[in-house]
A protein has these predicted regions:
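A short, well-structured juxtamembrane/interface segment
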Residues: 51-67
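Conserved mixed alpha/beta catalytic, RNA-binding, or beta-rich assembly cores of soluble enzyme
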Residues: 78-152, 158-159, 166-167, 171, ...
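C-terminal functional extensions of proteins
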Residues: 155, 169-215
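Alpha-helical scaffold segments in soluble metabolic enzymes
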Residues: 14-22, 40, 63-67, 84, ...
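Charged, compositionally biased N-terminal leader segments and the immediate start
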Residues: 1-32
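N-terminal glycine-rich anion-binding loops that anchor highly charged ligand groups
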Residues: 28-43
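Short, basic, glycine/proline-bearing loop/turn elements
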Residues: 44-52, 107-108
Length: 215
């Protein structure tokens, strides 16, 4: 039992070495900025199919880096995303992740209107001008609502939308139709995704800035 790797940094290093080895020629599909994100998603899920499913549209990484470096609010459609993000790194850039799905007022309004809390939460978050990034890992209705608000010019164009809701009802469809918005967008095509995937995508961007700034 003494031969296994014990140090967390060594475990992570070896994990990424394995990912690089097993990706093989697929590495060439991605840019220098995209590849760390792809690897981090695979590291989180242990699923190499994500290398075929992930899609980057409208230069999302550069757009995200600009607003993250200057500080912004990040709306998340689940508490799991908020809790999973690195608060230490976000704090260095004055970035604040938050969600409204558990807000009492949002819950009350959603019940009265007969819609999901994700819809109401997105309506409120979209009107906050400091919110530049949207991470959607659970609710297709949140992604549909965000698309609707963008197309009606009810909100400013986001700097980044990570649209990776998971599931069987509306997940694939919402991700597909959101591409029409021409907003900086990272998505996982098909049914796969989830809150942990949303977290890994933003971390893949954040760590690039973190290293660049020499922290």
């Amino acid at each position: 039992m003494g031969g296994y790797i014990k140090k967390p940094e060594d475990i992570e290093k070896r994990s990424f070495e394995i990912i690089t080895e097993e990706l093989g020629e697929k590495i060439k599909k991605f840019t220098e900025e995209e590849l760390p994100i792809v690897k981090r998603v695979i590291h989180t899920t242990a699923d190499f199919e994500y290398a075929d499913l992930i899609e980057f549209l409208e230069d999302p990484i550069s757009s995200a880096k600009e607003v993250l470096s200057g500080g912004c609010k990040i709306y998340c459609d689940t508490n799991m995303i908020v809790n999973g993000l690195s608060k230490n790194i976000l704090k260095k850039f004055n970035c604040i992740p938050y969600t409204l799905v558990s807000d009492a007022g949002v819950s009350k309004e959603a019940k009265a209107r007969g819609v999901t809390r994700s819809i109401v939460g997105m309506e409120h978050a979209g009107k906050d001008k400091e919110t530049k990034i949207f991470l959607i890992g659970n609710a297709p209705t949140a992604l549909y609502k965000l698309k609707e608000m963008i197309e009606k010019n009810e909100i400013e164009k986001p700097a980044l939308v990570v649209g990776v809701p998971v599931g069987f009802v509306g997940a694939k469809e919402s991700k597909d139709v959101f591409k029409d918005t021409k907003v900086p967008y990272i998505t996982i095509n098909g049914r796969k995704g989830g809150s942990t995937v949303a977290v890994s995508i933003l971390h893949g961007i954040l760590y690039q800035i973190y290293k660049r700034e020499g922290f």
